[in-house]
């Protein structure tokens, strides 16, 4: 039995966020989501920026529980569902806010979009020769499945249980990482490592330690992105990573691949972002293109 297909614009309301303009924007400073904060299936809320919003813009640019937040550019279609992680959040112009009608289950629409994006099914709605975008009108033309509402709800609820389990595990991982950071600070910053009482400290380090430049103990290379025509989602070639867009909590996520490459990083390499947010770190799980 085949499901009915409808255009996204027929079953949702969508809009872009606010343009960042320091000279024209008025109101009070409030946090907002930018493209970099939206990952595949989750939000990176560690480096939120703020801009001015007027009180009457809360409805226009505000987001609420169940809104689907979709990237307009960068990696068009990358999306996550908002669940009031932070109150009174707004969005910047690089993002679409999609709010479903009552005839659709927001979880089903989200998981459909997540799958379509991962499979490259959204590329037909992109515009641009080198830098890809998915403007509002194209977004509204995206054809999505529309099974009976009860079926949507069952699918959405079933898949959501896995996401909830993942989220709980990630919270536990974060607590463990915070504990590891505290231990690192205690040992290597405060120098309160086991046996420190009997260790002589010279110039801020134990007497037997040495200070080295990074390039004396590691190979440091700068990435060089291949042309976008070589990118794919079909796992052809090697995973390709550019900036923090594919960063995970600790390890990079292999979403985009490239059949052409000049610079590569081997497994267990440390990636250091050189563009905003500068200094973000991640680790490679395997050989990748950078």
Locate each region found by the language model:
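A generic structural signal for residues embedded in beta-strands
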Residues: 70-71, 272-273
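A short glycine-rich beta-alpha junction/loop motif
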Residues: 1-2, 89-96, 127-156, 287-290
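Non-catalytic DNA-recognition/assembly elements of restriction-modification systems
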Residues: 1-19, 141-225, 246
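Short, positively charged
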Residues: 107-138
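Sequence-specific dsDNA recognition surfaces
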Residues: 6-24, 36-68, 85, 199, ...
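Short, Lys/Arg- and Gly-enriched loop/turn segments at beta-strand edges
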Residues: 76-83, 279-284
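Ligand-binding loop in jelly-roll beta-barrel domains
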Residues: 85, 99-105, 285-289
């Amino acid at each position: 039995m085949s499901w009915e297909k409808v255009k996204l614009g027929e079953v949702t309301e969508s809009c872009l966020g606010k343009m960042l303009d320091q000279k024209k924007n008025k109101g009070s400073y409030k946090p907002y989501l930018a493209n970099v904060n939206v990952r595949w299936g989750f939000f990176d809320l560690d480096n939120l920026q703020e801009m001015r919003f007027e009180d009457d813009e809360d409805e226009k640019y505000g987001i609420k529980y169940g809104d689907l937040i979709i990237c307009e550019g960068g990696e068009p279609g990358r999306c996550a569902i908002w669940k009031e992680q932070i109150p009174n959040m707004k969005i910047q112009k690089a993002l679409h806010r999609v709010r479903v009608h009552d005839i659709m289950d927001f979880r089903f629409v989200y998981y459909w979009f997540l799958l379509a994006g991962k499979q490259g099914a959204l590329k037909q709605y992109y515009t641009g020769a080198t830098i890809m975008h998915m403007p509002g009108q194209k977004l509204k033309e995206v054809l999505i499945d529309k099974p009976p509402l009860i079926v949507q709800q069952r699918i959405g609820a079933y898949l959501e249980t896995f996401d909830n389990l993942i989220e709980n595990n990630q919270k536990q991982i974060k607590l463990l990482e915070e504990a590891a950071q505290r231990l690192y600070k205690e040992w290597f910053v405060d120098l309160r490592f086991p046996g420190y009482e009997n260790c002589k400290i010279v110039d801020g380090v134990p007497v037997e330690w040495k200070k080295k430049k990074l390039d004396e103990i590691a190979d440091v290379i700068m990435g060089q992105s291949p042309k976008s025509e070589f990118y794919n989602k079909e796992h052809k070639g090697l995973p390709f990573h550019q900036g923090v867009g594919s960063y995970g909590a600790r390890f990079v996520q292999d979403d985009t691949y490239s059949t052409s490459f000049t610079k590569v990083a081997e497994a267990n390499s440390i990636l250091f972002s050189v563009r905003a947010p500068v200094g973000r770190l991640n680790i490679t799980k395997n050989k990748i293109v950078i």
